């Protein structure tokens, strides 16, 4: 209503239209704080007055979600609960958090691998690789991005350990 917004993910069915703000951080230990939750809620509040056409039908937003690969601060969780903002983080909520979703689906992102450097991870992203299983299906990808055979073997061992847990 007030300004133009981009939505990272939009999901809908017959009854709902959901806006998802996805926050990705690659710095270990970083937490999503209350400012992030406030920002997402403000965007949702601005957008919920607009009408969107998805699936050939005019719709109003019914829910706003914040999804992140980090943990939330206690204040962010308290605010989200108070304002009914759906939040999914590394360890929140207790059931259905990002860790559980990854483990239940078996869709482990390769970014969790400690045996790859940041530069190697960037190269994999640049060629469209996201999941450990993508590398498992085609281990040659690792040598294609510059790993030596022995390095690739170590990465494959880690993938085996990660994907079997």
Language-model region placement:
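C-terminal extensions
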Residues: 99, 103-165
């Amino acid at each position: 209503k007030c300004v133009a917004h981009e939505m990272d993910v939009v999901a809908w069915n017959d009854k709902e239209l959901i806006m998802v703000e996805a926050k990705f951080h690659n710095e270990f230990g970083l937490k999503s704080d209350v400012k992030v939750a406030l920002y997402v809620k403000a965007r949702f509040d601005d957008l919920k007055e607009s009408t969107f056409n998805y699936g050939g039908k005019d719709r109003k937003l019914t829910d706003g979600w914040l999804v992140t690969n980090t943990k939330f601060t206690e204040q962010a969780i308290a605010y989200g609960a108070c304002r009914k903002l759906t939040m999914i983080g590394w360890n929140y909520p207790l059931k259905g958090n990002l860790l559980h979703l990854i483990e239940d689906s078996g869709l482990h992102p390769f970014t969790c691998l400690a045996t790859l450097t940041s530069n190697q991870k960037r190269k994999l992203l640049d060629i469209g690789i996201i999941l450990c299983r993508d590398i498992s299906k085609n281990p040659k990808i690792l040598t294609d991005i510059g790993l030596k055979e022995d390095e690739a073997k170590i990465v494959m061992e880690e993938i085996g350990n990660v994907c079997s847990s």
